[in-house]
Amino acid sequence: MLELYQTENCPYCVRVRGALADLGLDYIVRNEPDSHRERTRLKALSGQTFVPTLHDPERGVIIADDDDKIIEYVTEHYGRRVA
C-alpha cells in the first residue's frame, strides 16, 4: 500500500492528498513532526527530511519533496486523475 509522509498543514501535502482522493486510492498517512531534526523515520527511509514524500513499497519507489512528480506517478501507475 502507498505511504504518504507528510505534515497536516503543508500545502503541497494537501495537494497530494487531494489527488490521491480524486483517484480513490487507499494509502497510509505517515505524519511527520514539524521539525526536520525530528523526522528520523523519513530520513531513514529516503535519506532526506522534506515532505511530501511518497513511498510505494510494492514497486520500490520513493519520490521525495515533489508534489507534481508524486501526482504524475500515481496517475500514471494507479489510474487517471479526475480534475
In which residue ranges do the predicted regions lie?
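GST-like domain detector, emphasizing the conserved glutathione-binding G-site
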Residues: 1-9, 14-83
